[in-house]
Each structure stands twice: as structure tokens, then as C-alpha cells.
């Protein structure tokens, strides 16, 4: 029992270390120096770049139109056709707030916009200025029962008609942004499509218990998914040539991503402007030649919304990896599927967490039973082991040999009680990242005072109950500890971890509390069986 408790203590500390280490790697980014923040409002329809062809920032402002379906409301600037605002209609800005969550925005405090255009020899989005599109109407809304809403923005120059067509579909956060180019000029033209996400340079935020990453990410033919933080952008510009792929900006629970034509050759890039305190991640395609009299359509998609794994996987390969479970993904993914399955049945995410706990504990029950049986046998051997310690004294080699001989004779595995604890470590870490990354748990209520399972318990009731359950579990297996210092550590361990869990998401604390209560029930059941065999009663003294 001593070794089991020690291992549990070390396991929890190890889990804490792994979580802290991952937080340091992904989130503890030095904050860049703020310079000329007042100039951020000048960006508006800006293309941020150091190259000579993609448009630079401009003071001019176009007309702003609104596009809306049943899940988001978008603001589009007719100067350049950039998406400069998005409101997610099914997500509250704050708990119990009636205001929708704002993802894309462009104001004096924060810039986060999705830009796209045409550069190159005959591009209309050069440094000299952006295309000033014309459109009839100001508000375009997908009607109930309508399968598709197309909103064309039109611009004409030198005999060429450029249509930037936005396509919205019901229930989808994927916005099609297509260029339809009709060349009525006497000569061929050449354009280079590009798209980028521009964001105010910020550091990742959150606490050690609930860290959040804000920064870039991309996918290429060589790399399924890789983060590229704002600090990385400031150190070196990204320059990757690939077929297919995508670029994205991530934040807690939400993501915006440009997905180019997956059959085209693209260059993924990043750019920073420290003067205006901005960073961009984007792509540009290979030049496209349009003969006179011909029409060419260039397809691209913009995802701007929550990290919904199933929907994102349908939009682009590996886009669902923006729900980042770290190294425990192979456990977290099936756990999340199980969690959503149970939630669909019980219609409560808190009950679903308890359901997942029941399944996990049921799977581990044979090992748990073996653990307590092994512990009971080990306690039976304590008098003989104590006798060996007194007999062999300082002769540790002889004592070890005799102990191994005794274990073999009694068919006892001294490490038999460790396996369930070791198996629970990666499960706990996987659940931590599942609860951290799942937007489905954002503002999801349980019962009573727990109105948001993704946030800490506001009254710390769950952590206190968890600490009490650990204390009860400890008292159910009383074993004297020889070392007084170790005895004190073990006595205070429930209190230590109660304090440790005070600021963890309520969903994670609920899992640990449910796990402890189920373990108490399992332990009582197992001990009853051991008493019938005469094992438990013989060692309780």
C-alpha cells in the first residue's frame, strides 16, 4: 500500500509536470513590444506584405455589407471584398449573455480580418489600391429552406469583368469565396490569387490550469498540422511550397482558415508588421493565365467559426487537427467520440462525463481488482518482510534475494498494484486536453451552480468534494507508514490536490470526483470478496 500511495502521488505530480511542460511549449510566448498601436485603425482593408505585388495598407474605406445564414453574420468591405467581421449566432460572447460571440473584427483595439484578392501582372489588388467592387444591396440573408445564397461583387477594368462571389449554405461555417473572371480584352491576362488572415500580434493567454493558444497554424503535403506562433512569424517568414493544404489562425475554441484549391500549387507564407503590430498567415497560388474571350473560376473557402471536428474534417483534410490534443490524441479522440455519444443520449455534458468515467472504470476494473488483490497479499507478507529486515539488517543484497524468493513462493507481484495507476495517467491527460479543446463544453451547464463545465467551479464545491473523496478513499485502506515524513505527505495529499484542482475546469474535476466515488464502490465490493477468501480480514490488523 505504501508503494501504491507513493506511486499515485508521483503519478499525479508527473501529470502536473506534463501539463505544465506542454503549456510552456505551446503557450508561454514572450510578449512582443507594442509599437504605434494607434495606427491599427488605419488597416481596414489591408494586405500585409513586404513583397511588391500584394496590396499594402490603404486609408480608403469601402461600403460594408452584411452576409448572414443561420450560424454566422459576416461583414464584408466592398473595397477589396475582405471579410472584416463575423458574429457566431449560436455562441454567446459571455455566459448568459444575449450578444453573439465576435470572431473576426476590425477596430482600434483589435484587428482580425480575412483578406483575399488577385495580384500579379494584371491583378486588381496591387499596392496602388484595391478593387472597389459594386453590389446591389446592403444586407443579404439566407432564407429558411433556401439551400444556397450567392452574393456577387463586381468590378470592371480594361475590358475584364471580375466577380467575387460569396456563397453561404445553411448550417455551415464554411464560406465559399470564388473569383469569376471574364476576359473581354483583346489580350490574355495573368493573375495570382492570394488569401491571408491578419491579426493583431498578441501573446497566448490563460492560466497554467487553463492555457489558451492564439496564433497561426498550417497544413501542407509534408506536414498534416503544425502550429506557427506569432513569435515564430517575427523570427522568420514561413515559405512552404505545397499542393493542397491550408492556413489558419487559432484561438481557444475557435478558428479561421483559408482553404485554397486543393489541386493547385500554392505557397504558404507569413508576414509581420511590427510598426502596426500585425501578423499575417496566408497562401498564394501559381499564376493563372486567362485567354481573351475566356472565363476562369478560382475556388477558395474560408472557415470562420468554432472548432467542430466533424464539420472541419469535411471541409479540408486535417483541418480537424486544429482541435489539438497533443501527444495523447490517440486516446482523446475515441474518448471525445464516446463523450458525444453519451451526451446525445442523456442531453447533459456533465452526465456524459460521468458516463465516460463509468466506462473507463469498467474497462479498468479487472486490473483494479488485481491491484487490490495484490495489495492484500502484500499486506499478508508484511510480518515476514519485517522479519527479513531485522534478520539481514544492512545486507541489502541478501534481503532483496530473500524478498524475491518469498514473492515467488507466495505468487505475489510487488508491482501488481501499479498498472491501473499507470494506465490512468495518459487517460487523465487525454481527458484534460479533451475538456480544454472541446468547444461543445463551452458554457455547457451541469446542475445547480455549475453552469460552465469548461470553467472553474465558481464556489469550489467540486474540488472540495473531490478532496473529501480522496480522503475517504485513503481511509478505506489504512496502512501504517513507517516513515513519519512520508506519513505526513500521504495524510495531506487530498488537501494538496484539492488546492491543485481549485482552478481546473469543472468538467475535469467532475471526472476525478466521479472516478474517486466509483473507486470507493469498487474497493468496497472487492474487499467483500477478499474477506470471504480470508485475505482482507487477515491483514487489516
From Swiss-Prot:
GO terms for molecular function: membrane insertase activity. It is found in: Cell inner membrane. Required for the insertion and/or proper folding and/or complex formation of integral membrane proteins into the membrane. Involved in integration of membrane proteins that insert both dependently and independently of the Sec translocase complex, as well as at least some lipoproteins. Aids folding of multispanning membrane proteins. GO terms for cellular component: plasma membrane. It is a multi-pass membrane protein. It comes from the Bacteria. InterPro entries: Membr_insert_YidC (IPR019998), Membr_insert_YidC_N (IPR028053), YidC/ALB3/OXA1/COX18 (IPR001708), YidC/Oxa/ALB_C (IPR028055), YidC_ALB_C (IPR047196), YidC_periplasmic_sf (IPR038221). Interacts with the Sec translocase complex via SecD. Specifically interacts with transmembrane segments of nascent integral membrane proteins during membrane integration. NCBIfam families: PRK01318.1-1 (NF002351), PRK01318.1-3 (NF002352), yidC_nterm (TIGR03593), yidC_oxa1_cterm (TIGR03592). This is Membrane protein insertase YidC. Pfam families: 60KD_IMP, YidC_periplas. Belongs to the OXA1/ALB3/YidC family. Type 1 subfamily. The chain crosses the membrane at residues 7-27, 345-365, 415-435, 453-473, 492-512. One of its GO terms (biological process) is protein insertion into membrane. The keyword Ligase does not apply. Keywords: Cell inner membrane, Cell membrane, Chaperone, Membrane, Protein transport, Transmembrane, Transmembrane helix, Transport.
Amino acid at each position: 500500500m505504501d508503494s501504491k500511495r507513493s506511486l499515485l502521488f508521483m503519478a499525479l505530480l508527473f501529470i502536473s509536470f506534463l501539463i505544465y511542460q506542454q503549456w510552456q511549449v505551446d503557450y508561454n510566448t514572450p510578449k512582443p513590444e507594442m509599437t504605434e498601436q494607434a495606427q491599427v485603425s488605419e488597416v481596414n482593408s489591408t494586405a500585409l506584405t513586404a513583397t511588391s505585388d500584394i496590396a499594402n495598407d490603404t486609408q480608403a474605406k469601402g461600403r460594408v455589407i452584411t452576409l448572414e445564414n443561420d450560424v454566422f453574420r459576416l461583414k464584408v468591405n466592398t473595397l477589396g471584398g475582405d471579410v472584416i467581421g463575423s458574429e457566431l449566432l449560436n455562441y454567446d460572447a459571455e455566459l448568459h449573455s444575449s450578444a453573439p460571440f465576435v470572431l473576426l473584427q476590425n477596430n482600434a483595439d483589435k484587428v482580425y480580418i480575412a483578406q483575399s484578392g488577385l495580384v500579379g501582372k494584371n491583378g486588381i489588388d496591387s499596392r496602388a489600391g484595391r478593387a472597389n467592387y459594386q453590389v446591389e444591396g446592403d444586407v443579404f440573408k439566407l432564407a429558411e429552406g433556401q439551400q444556397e445564397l450567392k452574393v456577387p461583387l463586381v468590378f470592371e477594368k480594361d475590358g475584364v469583368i471580375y466577380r467575387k462571389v460569396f456563397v453561404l449554405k445553411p448550417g455551415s461555417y464554411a464560406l465559399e469565396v470564388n473569383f469569376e473572371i471574364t476576359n473581354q480584352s483583346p489580350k490574355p491576362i495573368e493573375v495570382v490569387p492570394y488569401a491571408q488572415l491578419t491579426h493583431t500580434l498578441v501573446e497566448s493567454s490563460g492560466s497554467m490550469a487553463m492555457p489558451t493558444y492564439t496564433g497561426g497554424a498550417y497544413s501542407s503535403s509534408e506536414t498534416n498540422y503544425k502550429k506557427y506562433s506569432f513569435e515564430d512569424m517575427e523570427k522568420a517568414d514561413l515559405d512552404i511550397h505545397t499542393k493542397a493544404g491550408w492556413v489558419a489562425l487559432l484561438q481557444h475554441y475557435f478558428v479561421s482558415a483559408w482553404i485554397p484549391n486543393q489541386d493547385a500549387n500554392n505557397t504558404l507564407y507569413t508576414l509581420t508588421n511590427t510598426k502596426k503590430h500585425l501578423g499575417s498567415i496566408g497562401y498564394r497560388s501559381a499564376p493563372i493565365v486567362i485567354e481573351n474571350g475566356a472565363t476562369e473560376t478560382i475556388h477558395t473557402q474560408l472557415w470562420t467559426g468554432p472548432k467542430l471536428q466533424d464539420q472541419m474534417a469535411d471541409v479540408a483534410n486535417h483541418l480537424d487537427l486544429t482541435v489539438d490534443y497533443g501527444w495523447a490524441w490517440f486516446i482523446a479522440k475515441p474518448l471525445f467520440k464516446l463523450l458525444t455519444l453519451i451526451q446525445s443520449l442523456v442531453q447533459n455534458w456533465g452526465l456524459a462525463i460521468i458516463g465516460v468515467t463509468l466506462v473507463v472504470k469498467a474497462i479498468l476494473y479487472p486490473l483494479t481488482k488485481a491491484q487490490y488483490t495484490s495489495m492484500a497479499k502484500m499486506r499478508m507478507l508484511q510480518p515476514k518482510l519485517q522479519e527479513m529486515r531485522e534478520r539481514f539488517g544492512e545486507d541489502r543484497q541478501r534481503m532483496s534475494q530473500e524478498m524475491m524468493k518469498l514473492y515467488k513462493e507466495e505468487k505475489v507481484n510487488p508491482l501488481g498494484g501499479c498498472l491501473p495507476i499507470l494506465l490512468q495517467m495518459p487517460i487523465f491527460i487525454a481527458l484534460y486536453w479533451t475538456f480544454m479543446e472541446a468547444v461543445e463544453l463551452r458554457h455547457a451547464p451541469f446542475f445547480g451552480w455549475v453552469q460552465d463545465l469548461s470553467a472553474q467551479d465558481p464556489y469550489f464545491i467540486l474540488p472540495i468534494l473531490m478532496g473529501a473523496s480522496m480522503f475517504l478513499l485513503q481511509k478505506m485502506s489504512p496502512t501504517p507508514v513507517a516513515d513519519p515524513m512520508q506519513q505526513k505527505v500521504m495524510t495531506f495529499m487530498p488537501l494538496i490536490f484539492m488546492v491543485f484542482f481549485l482552478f481546473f475546469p469543472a468538467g475535469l474535476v467532475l471526472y476525478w470526483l466521479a472516478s474517486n466515488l466509483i473507486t470507493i464502490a469498487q474497493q468496497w465490493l472487492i474487499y467483500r470478496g477478499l474477506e470471504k477468501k480470508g485475505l482482507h480480514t487477515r491483514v487489516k490488523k
